[in-house]
Amino acid sequence: MTRLSAAPFLSIACIAAIAAVTLPGCGKPEYCAKKTEFNSSVTTLTSVSLTPPDPTEINTDITNVQNAGTAMINAAQSDFPSQSTALENAVNDVVATGKTLTTSKDLTATGITLAAQLLTLNSAWNSFKTATNDACS
């Protein structure tokens, strides 16, 4: 390469290197970015409401947990297999119970089961957060 043709290449390479260093989240695993979305979906699902729960809303919230969880778990599976598997199992249990909820009467019948599963989900989520904290900070 001649001196004139190398200059634009080097300029582009320098800009790319600077951008890679200064962009937030660069160098962090993919699951780190996905933790925020999953946390938000779990918080929405487990938030206490003063109005009677609507099975349709609950199922929408469960679907959001499932979608965000699947993306995050798939990204973390190779680095944190036991925590990912525990979280995946907890999400799957909540999803399976959610599929049985079509009326408020269904919610009354399965409310205790769902509440216990949400506690398990929260525990698995806390373990996952603890395990991935160093990689994501």
Q: Where does each model-flagged region fall?
A:
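Long, amphipathic, charge-rich alpha-helical segments that form helical bundles/coiled-coils
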Residues: D61-W125
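Sec-dependent bacterial lipoprotein signal peptides
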Residues: M1-P24
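Immediate post-signal-peptide N-terminus of mature secreted/exported proteins
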Residues: C26-T70
